[in-house]
């Protein structure tokens, strides 16, 4: 009689067989067993694990389905940002990309890794000791959403790495996508069942990963291709991008078979054309190709610019186009007042999406294209994403059309629409008196990358603004649960009488009579003979209501309580988030971050004259003037005061950066004021001759001539300073500069950090802080934090489960610090956790 196999051995054998089948199917494209056999093996494994729950593990193939997310996705901070790529649409742009790399690295024919650019959803997969522990979306590049449970359902993603030699921590970056055939089959099945079909494979992939129930995601035919790595700790990777991809394939990750190594711009363009010709026959959607410098050391030398690497480029295919009819041209007002013309179109399918609106960019673009209502136009999804009107089919223009003109008044508030000299953009002059601008300002203020008020959707923002409940963003911090519930009750009522019927359920007799009196006061005929004013809802809210008793009749209140909690949570923020949330024109996240790093305190920034902003890296004259204009407005200063008075707290204030001492001087200020004829050389001469604007204003020409300043420059300077507003700006800027410099230590008094010149390595898991936080604190004390141990390492910080780095440090005689010693050292030097 044959003995029954040991359950643990059988489970191990089944797991290995199933994962091997997954690897052969998704990575090697060499299916070895039939689907029915695969299903039989999986069912057997499920039965064995159910009978022996002590043998179940997180990396078992049976654990791909069954995880339920919380009511929302948790945020994940990417250790290494998931950067976007620069785009190219022409051969010339590709040639320029190659030229820059050639010159920087002094290589005549750089070698690149070229690969298709999948039209899916970018994700990051984190593995620790070979096991999948977390998956996140790209999000804004710095912060994504934890979609681990959903990613477990994607069979192409390994739950445990194959082979050996992988780093202790490995983040793999790639694209989740929906194959075309699977997309069509899924939609066909949905039509048979009367279910909802997917618009296109890209939307299908993105929507599937954002399901809160992983069982729904598991029903979607998703796949995955790896294209790079993020954080790597305690381990090494091959020296080139192409060999790194080959290594990822050996560890179990699918990598596109279309990846190639090519040389120079000619090799890149040949690859681009070949993939473009094959595009329609590929089993998945792509919207271009990606070029990456193959040499990883070269990538590090090239570095990054803004939010994109200098060593990579996305070469987009020509946008897909269709023709349709312009039914109307309307104006949309943005948060800075920009009036953007939008074409309302007869619905048309473009690249798998129904397009009903397309941007016309600005009035100059409309005039150049001569777009008119009634025209047949070519609609393009530029970069396969943003619909735009690319041209007019003039021969199909109907008779009687008229050239379009920018309206003179804002369609929302009636304020004048004006165009600043030299600008392409027209703007509503109503500023925050314009409801459209207020709504956009609110949307921006509460967005995730700004104040991050979760749960405040666009429609409810419209209700808040239209009702007059909030006039400025600071009014958010005056809201309470009762107001929110009343607001929803009123905004969802289709008539005053419908509202009164509902209100009666939540009010005592006296309070209800008070509401009826208020209704009469705003012009509502309680008998119902006369029609109610169209603005009755807003008028009623402005008139005020008594407190409702929500316990008289049960009503859903959790949403309002959650929203108030989110508003309360947002009170504690950082300076860069606060600055970004203010919605200052031209001030994005990177600019806000730079302002925070250089100036340190809101009170400093909000009172600086604009020329001083120009010394911050990446801030030019246009951005500096925009900052100055914003803070010059009394209404904006009042809005900031209101936010602070209502409890918004900026928790990361710090002194101005010592770098300002080397960046600011009287000569620099002369240069940055944009005075005609005052070049950097002339600014140095002027600064050598005199020390202040007060002295310059009082000075005669002779001392300046004797200092070598040409007479035309002196005349231009004197003419500029003769205007009172210029003299006031110059003297205010110098006073502000002197005040800033007075806060900084003298150059010879700046003390070296306790770890200056020392190289430190961190390994293992720390309990009190993340490794990234430890790195930041050590770097602030002067250390260079490296990824590998060598004889030059000053000391190694070893947390729990320290790996090979600890062994190497001990063999080299490197000093070992435990977490307690690290925390004590940080505390001693003002970096307490």
UniProtKB/Swiss-Prot annotation:
Q: SMART domains recorded for this chain?
A: BRCT (SM00292), LIGANc (SM00532)
* An example Gene Ontology CC term for this record: cytosol
Instruction: List keywords of the entry alphabetically.
Output: DNA damage, DNA repair, DNA replication, Ligase, Magnesium, Manganese, Metal-binding, NAD, Zinc
Q: Which reaction does it catalyse?
A: NAD(+) + (deoxyribonucleotide)n-3'-hydroxyl + 5'-phospho-(deoxyribonucleotide)m = (deoxyribonucleotide)n+m + AMP + beta-nicotinamide D-nucleotide
Q: Please tell me where NAD(+) binds in this chain.
A: 35-39, 84-85, 115, 138, 175, 292, 316
Q: Which cofactor does it need?
A: Mg(2+); Mn(2+)
Q: Where is the BRCT domain?
A: 750-833
Task: Kindly indicate whether the keyword Magnesium belongs to this entry.
Answer: yes
Q: Which GO terms describe its biological process?
A: DNA repair; DNA replication
Q: Which SUPFAM superfamilies match?
A: BRCT domain, DNA ligase/mRNA capping enzyme, catalytic domain, Nucleic acid-binding proteins, RuvA domain 2-like
Per the record's keyword annotation, is Transport included, yes or no? Answer: no
Q: CDD domains attached here?
A: BRCT_DNA_ligase_like (cd17748), LIGANc (cd00114)
- Stated role: DNA ligase that catalyzes the formation of phosphodiester linkages between 5'-phosphoryl and 3'-hydroxyl groups in double-stranded DNA using NAD as a coenzyme and as the energy source for the reaction. It is essential for DNA replication and repair of damaged DNA.
The Swiss-Prot or TrEMBL record describes its family as follows: Belongs to the NAD-dependent DNA ligase family. LigA subfamily.
What protein name applies here?
DNA ligase
Q: Identify the coding gene.
A: ligA
């Amino acid at each position: 009689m044959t003995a029954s196999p040991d359950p643990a051995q059988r489970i191990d054998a089944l797991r290995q067989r199933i994962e091997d089948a997954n690897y052969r199917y998704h990575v090697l494209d060499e299916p070895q067993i039939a689907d029915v056999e695969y299903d039989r093996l999986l069912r057997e494994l499920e039965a064995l694990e159910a009978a022996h729950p002590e043998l179940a593990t997180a990396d078992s193939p049976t654990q791909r389905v069954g995880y339920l997310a919380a009511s929302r996705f948790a945020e994940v901070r990417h250790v290494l940002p998931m950067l976007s790529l620069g785009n190219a649409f022409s051969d010339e742009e590709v040639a320029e990309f190659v030229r820059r790399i050639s010159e920087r690295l002094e290589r005549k024919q750089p070698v690149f890794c070229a690969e298709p650019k999948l039209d899916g959803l970018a994700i990051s997969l984190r593995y620790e000791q070979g096991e999948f522990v977390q998956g996140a979306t790209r999000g804004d590049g710095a912060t994504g959403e934890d979609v681990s449970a959903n990613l477990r359902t994607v069979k192409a993603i390994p739950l445990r790495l194959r082979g050996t030699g992988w780093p202790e921590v490995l983040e793999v970056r790639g694209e989740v996508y929906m194959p075309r055939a699977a997309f069509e089959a899924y939609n066909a099945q949905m039509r048979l069942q009367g279910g909802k079909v997917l618009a296109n494979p890209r939307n299908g992939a993105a929507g599937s990963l954002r399901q809160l129930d992983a069982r729904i995601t598991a029903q979607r035919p998703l796949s995955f291709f790896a294209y790079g790595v993020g954080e790597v700790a305690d381990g090494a990777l091959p020296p080139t991008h192409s060999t790194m991809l080959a290594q990822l394939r050996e560890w179990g990750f699918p990598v596109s078979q279309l990846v190639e190594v090519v040389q120079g711009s000619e090799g890149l363009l040949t690859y681009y054309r070949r993939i473009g010709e094959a595009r329609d026959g590929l089993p998945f959607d792509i919207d271009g190709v990606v070029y990456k410098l193959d040499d990883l050391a070269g990538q590090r030398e090239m570095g990054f610019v803004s939010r994109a690497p200098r060593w990579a480029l996305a070469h987009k295919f020509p946008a897909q186009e269709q023709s349709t009819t312009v039914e109307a041209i309307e104006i949309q007002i943005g948060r800075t007042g920009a009036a953007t013309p939008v074409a309302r179109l007869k619905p048309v399918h473009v690249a798998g999406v129904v397009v009903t609106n397309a941007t016309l960019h600005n009035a100059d673009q409309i005039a150049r294209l001569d777009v008119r209502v009634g025209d047949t136009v070519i609609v393009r999804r530029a970069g396969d994403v943003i619909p735009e009107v690319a041209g007019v089919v003039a021969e199909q223009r109907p008779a009687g059309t008229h050239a379009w003109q920018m309206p003179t008044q804002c369609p929302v508030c009636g304020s004048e629409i004006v165009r600043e000299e030299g600008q392409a953009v027209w703007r509503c002059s109503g500023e925050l008196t314009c409801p459209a601008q207020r709504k956009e300002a609110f949307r921006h203020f509460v967005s995730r990358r700004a104040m991050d008020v979760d749960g405040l959707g666009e429609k409810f923002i419209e209700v808040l603004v239209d009702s007059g409940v909030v006039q400025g963003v600071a009014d958010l911090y005056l809201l309470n649960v009762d107001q929110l519930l009343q607001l929803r009750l009123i905004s969802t009522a289709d008539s005053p009488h419908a509202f009164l019927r509902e209100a009666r359920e939540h009010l005592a007799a006296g309070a209800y009579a008070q509401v009826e009196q208020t209704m009469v006061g705003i012009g509502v005929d309680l008998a119902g003979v006369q029609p109610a004013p169209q603005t009755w809802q807003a008028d009623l809210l402005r008139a005020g209501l008594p407190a409702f008793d929500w316990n008289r009749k049960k009503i859903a209140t959790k949403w309002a309580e959650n929203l108030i909690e989110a508003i309360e949570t947002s009170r504690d923020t950082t300076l860069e988030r606060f600055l970004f949330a203010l919605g200052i024109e031209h001030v994005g996240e990177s600019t806000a971050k730079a302002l925070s790093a250089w100036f340190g305190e809101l009170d400093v920034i909000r009172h600086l004259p604009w020329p001083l902003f120009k010394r911050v890296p990446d801030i030019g004259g246009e951005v500096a003037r925009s900052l100055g204009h914003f803070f010059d407005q009394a209404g904006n200063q009042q809005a900031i005061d209101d936010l602070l008075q209502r409890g918004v707290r900026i928790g990361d204030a710090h002194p101005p950066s010592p770098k300002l001492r080397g960046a600011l001087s009287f000569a620099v200020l002369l240069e940055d004021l944009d005075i005609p004829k005052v070049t950097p050389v002339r600014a140095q001469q002027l600064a050598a001759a005199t020390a202040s604007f007060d002295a310059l204003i009082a000075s005669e020409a002779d001392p300046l001539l004797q200092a070598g300043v040409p007479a035309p420059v002196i005349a231009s300077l004197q003419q500029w300073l003769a205007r009172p507003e210029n003299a006031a700006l110059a003297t205010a800027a110098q006073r502000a500069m002197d005040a800033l410099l007075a806060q900084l230590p003298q150059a010879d008094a700046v003390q070296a950090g306790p770890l200056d010149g020392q190289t430190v390595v961190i390994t293992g898991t720390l309990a009190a802080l993340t490794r990234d936080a430890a790195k930041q604190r050590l770097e602030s004390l002067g250390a260079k934090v490296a990824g590998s141990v060598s004889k030059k390492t000053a000391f190694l910080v070893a947390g729990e489960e320290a790996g090979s780095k600890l062994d190497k440090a001990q063999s080299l005689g490197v000093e070992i610090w435990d977490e307690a010693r690290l925390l004590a050292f940080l505390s001693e030097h003002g970096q307490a956790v």
